[in-house]
Amino acid sequence: MEGGEEEVERIPDELFDTKKKHLLDKLIRVGIILVLLIWGTVLLLKSIPHHSNTPDYQEPNSNYTNDGKLKVSFSVVRNNTFQPKYHELQWISDNKIESNDLGLYVTFMNDSYVVKSVYDDSYNSVLLEGKTFIHNGQNLTVESITASPDLKRLLIRTNSVQNWRHSTFGSYFVYDKSSSSFEEIGNEVALAIWSPNSNDIAYVQDNNIYIYSAISKKTIRAVTNDGSSFLFNGKPDWVYEEEVFEDDKAAWWSPTGDYLAFLKIDESEVGEFIIPYYVQDEKDIYPEMRSIKYPKSGTPNPHAELWVYSMKDGTSFHPRISGNKKDGSLLITEVTWVGNGNVLVKTTDRSSDILTVFLIDTIAKTSNVVRNESSNGGWWEITHNTLFIPANETFDRPHNGYVDILPIGGYNHLAYFENSNSSHYKTLTEGKWEVVNGPLAFDSMENRLYFISTRKSSTERHVYYIDLRSPNEIIEVTDTSEDGVYDVSFSSGRRFGLLTYKGPKVPYQKIVDFHSRKAEKCDKGNVLGKSLYHLEKNEVLTKILEDYAVPRKSFRELNLGKDEFGKDILVNSYEILPNDFDETLSDHYPVFFFAYGGPNSQQVVKTFSVGFNEVVASQLNAIVVVVDGRGTGFKGQDFRSLVRDRLGDYEARDQISAASLYGSLTFVDPQKISLFGWSYGGYLTLKTLEKDGGRHFKYGMSVAPVTDWRFYDSVYTERYMHTPQENFDGYVESSVHNVTALAQANRFLLMHGTGDDNVHFQNSLKFLDLLDLNGVENYDVHVFPDSDHSIRYHNANVIVFDKLLDWAKRAFDGQFVK
C-alpha cells in the first residue's frame, strides 16, 4: 500500500482545478482505508484454520484426540497420574521357619507396624504402634525399620541424611517389644545389620565397625579402630558404592552369626575431585567446596582387603587374596557365605578380564583359588547373585555348593558348582537366551531353583524353575503365552511369593502359594501354584486410562543391514506413534529418538510406563523411537562385547542406521529427526551427531554426558575400555572430539548439573571449550546449579524436562533451520 500512495502524490496539480483536487483527495483517502481493510481481512482469514463441518475436528494444539479422549501431558505425568502402585513385603528372614513357612512379613497398617501372614489372614502381631516415639524428650519419626529374625526387636532409623546415591546416615535405635523400650545405638551411623541369630547388630560409625548386643542393650566391642576419612571398614567408598556393590553395605554375617566378613577399603592413593556448590546457602559469598575421592580411568583405585571377625574369640584375620592382576589392582566384587565357616570371594583385575574366585576357610584360616577364568574377548560383568546351595543327601547334594551365572555357548546361563571347593560345575540352563542377573531363589524343600530369563523373548521377563537333579528341564512359572515382564520375591521358606507383573498391560501384584499342586492355567499370570489373593490390581489406574489416549508402544526387531562379516544386524526397538496418526500424509511427522545404549543395558523391554516419551508423542505429534543397538544386553555375548575398547562406535552407527530407515518412510519429515539421551545416552547423542555429520540427525539433546572417558570413573570405564595407558587410541576415538562434524547438524542442546558427582561437569566444560576453539556455535546450553546427576535441585527436574520439550518443539517448528 505504501507504493500506491507515492504514485498518487506525484500526479501533476495543473491537470485539476481546486475543487476537483479536494474531492479527489477525499476519494483517495477513503480508497486507501478500504484497501487497508480488505488487505487486513484477507490476512485475518488466512490466519484462521479452515474448519471442516465434521464433528471430530480439533484445534492443532488441542488437548483432545479426534475421538474425544485426553492427550497425555506433562501435568498429569508429573502428578503420578499414570504411576502404578507397587508394594514391597519385608519378609521375615528366619531360616528356622523354612519347613513351616507361614509367609510372615512386616508391614505398616492401622497406624502400627505389624507382622502378618500371607497364609493366615487372621495372624496379626503388633510390633510397634505409631510412626513416632519420644527419646530424651525428643519426638522422633520412624523412617525405616528392620525386624530381628526372631521378631522380638526392631532396628529403627531416624534423622536420616542422604550421602551418595545408595548411602544414608542416621540415628539408630533398638526397640524391645517385651519391655516397650527404645535404646539408642548411635548418631551418624552409616550402616546397621542384624545378625541371623537376632543377638547382635553390626554397625558402622566414623568408618569403624562396632557390635551392639541386643541382649545386654549396649555396644560390647569395637571390631576395628583404624577407620578414617580415607579408610572405610564395612562401608564402601564412593566408587565401590556406585560401581561395585550399588549398595551401602560392605559387611556380611555368616548364616549362624558366628562370623562377620567385611571389607577394609583404603582410598588414600585415590585422586581427589573438588565439587563447588554455589547455592546451598544464600548467605554464602564463596562456593562451598566438597571433596570426593574419585578414581578416574588409569589412576590409582582404592585398595580393598577382606577381613573376617570371629564373635567367639573377638579376633579378626586377613585371608590372603591374590590373583592374575596386570597392574597390582584388585577389585573384590562379591562376598558370599557358603556355609557357616566358608566364604566365597569373587575378584577381578581392574579391567575385568580375569575372574578369580577364592574360598576362605574361617576355621582353618586359609584361602584357596577355586576358579580362575578369562573373559575371552568380553568382560566379567559385576553381579551379586551367587546363591548358596546347602548339602542335602536326600536330594543328592553331598556337599555345600553354589549356583553362579556363566557365559555358556555365548549366553549367560546357570551353572551349579556342586562342591564349593571345586571348579567343576553342572550346566543347568543353555540356549540362545539369557538368565537375567542370576539365580533368584532356592527352595530346599522342593529342590527347586527359581530364575528369571529371556527364554521367550529378549524383551520379556518370565519366571521359571528347574530341579537341580534335572538340568535343562525348565518349568514355566508365569504364563508365556502372553507377553509379560515379571518379578517375584519369596518368603523365607520359598513357599510363598509376591508375584509382580510389570507390563505391558496395567501392572498387578498377587500372592502365590508355589507349593500348591494346583496348576492354575486359567489364572492370569502364573501357571504354577495357587493364587491366594491380589495385593494390588491398580484398578484406579485402569479407570483413569479409559479417559486418555495413551500412545501405544509397538515392539519390533529392526534389521539395520549387514555387518562387516555379512551378518544381519538385528536390534530390538519400539516406536510410539502420535495420536490420530495418518500414514497417508507425506513428509509430515518428526521423529524423536530416545537413546541410552550403555554396555549390557536395555531400554526396549515390555514394561508398562507412561512418561516423557508419551508426552513427546502426544504434545509434539512426533514418532518416538527407541533402539537398543549393539553393545546392549540380553542378546548374547557377541552382540554386546564387540564394543570393547571402542565405546561410541557401533552404538552410534546403529542409531544412524535406524534414523536412515525412518527417514525413508513417506510419512516422515527427514529434516526433523532428533536424538535425546541422558548420561550414557547423552554421550551417545553427541557421538551420533559427530559420526552422522548432519546427514540424518538434524537435532540432538544431550543431558549430563560423558565426553571423554578419561574423566569417568575407573571401575566402570576400564571394564569396557581397559586403561588409557593400554588403549590410548581407543580413548581418543571414543571421546567426542570431531566437533566440527556437530556443526553440520541444525542445532543441539547441552544440559548438565554443576554438582554432578557421577559424570562431572568437567565433561561438559571441556566439550564447550572444544566448541569454542573450533568456532562451533549451533548449540544451546543450560546449566543447573548444584544439581547432581539426576538434576533435581531447586526445581531443576521440572525445568530440565520443560526445556527438552520446548526445545524439541522449536526444532520441529523449524526455528533452528540454518
UniProtKB/Swiss-Prot annotation:
Key words of the record: Aminopeptidase, Glycoprotein, Hydrolase, Membrane, Protease, Serine protease, Signal-anchor, Transmembrane, Transmembrane helix, Vacuole
Gene3D superfamilies: alpha/beta hydrolase (3.40.50.1820), Dipeptidylpeptidase IV, N-terminal domain (2.140.10.30)
Keyword Cell membrane part of the UniProt annotation: no
One GO cellular component term noted in the UniProt record for this chain: fungal-type vacuole membrane
Membrane topology, Lumenal segments: 46-818
Presence of the UniProt keyword tRNA-binding in the record: no
Topological domains annotated Cytoplasmic: 1-29
Active site residues of this protein: S679 (charge relay system), D756 (charge relay system), H789 (charge relay system)
Listed transmembrane segments: 30-45
Glycosylated position list: N63, N79, N110, N139, N372, N392, N421, N738
GO molecular function annotation: aminopeptidase activity; dipeptidyl-peptidase activity; serine-type endopeptidase activity
InterPro entries: AB_hydrolase_fold, Pept_S9_AS, Peptidase_S9_cat, Peptidase_S9B_N, Serine_Prot_S9B/DPPIV
Entry-linked SUPFAM superfamilies: alpha/beta-Hydrolases (SSF53474), DPP6 N-terminal domain-like (SSF82171)
E.C. no: 3.4.14.-
GO BP terms in the entry: protein processing; proteolysis
The protein's name in its UniProt record: Dipeptidyl aminopeptidase B
Species the sequence originates in: Saccharomyces cerevisiae (strain ATCC 204508 / S288c)
